[in-house]
């Protein structure tokens, strides 16, 4: 799906770092929150596809009008931040982690 010039400009500025991204609709409402090991690769992947796994993703991409991101020190930090932002914004396109009864966890191994 072809991205608007505004979105293309955002994609060029995304870093190759872990973090969280927020997709906004034309009303400025957060419609999706996601995490990435590599923000540039992950966010760009939404706009470089010819086909999508499901209609939900296709509809989401059509509604994206702006993108913000937050760089995280690690992928684990991004996961925790993603969970908090999903609970804060309750984006319509996020299904997992949406209810307050789910808890992300990290296993520490030696």
Language model region names:
Residues 1-110:
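Acidic, glycine-enriched active-site microenvironments
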């Amino acid at each position: 799906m072809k991205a608007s010039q505004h979105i293309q400009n955002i994609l060029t500025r995304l870093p190759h770092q872990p973090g969280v991204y927020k997709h906004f609709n034309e009303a400025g409402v957060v419609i999706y929150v996601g995490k990435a090991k590599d923000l540039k690769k992950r966010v760009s992947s939404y706009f470089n596809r010819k086909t999508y796994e499901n209609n939900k993703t296709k509809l989401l991409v059509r509604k994206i009008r702006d993108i913000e991101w937050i760089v995280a020190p690690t992928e684990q930090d991004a996961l925790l931040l993603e969970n908090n932002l999903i609970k804060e914004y309750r984006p319509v396109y996020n299904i997992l982690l949406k209810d307050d009864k789910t808890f992300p966890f990290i296993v520490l191994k030696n």
